[in-house]
Amino acid sequence: MSDTPTAEDIAQHYSAAMDSVNLINALMAQDSRTTEEQDTVSRNVEHLQIMVAKDYWTTEDLTPLNNAITAGS
């Protein structure tokens, strides 16, 4: 069995990463965040850092992921 993700798998990974991007952006747009919200940002930044490091990306635009990592860090 191959560990290489299919195009569908990659699309699902990208969609999940974009969910993290949208959540980080929404929380960082607030004037302040609760401890729980900041923890959520941190977990999602970690998720994006892991995802950006994957070597299976092809034509996907990783700019929003990198921007959210920067915004949430």
Label the model's feature ranges.
Residues 2-35:
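N-terminal acidic leader/helix
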Residues 26, 35-73:
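Short, charge-rich amphipathic interface segments used for partner binding and complex assembly
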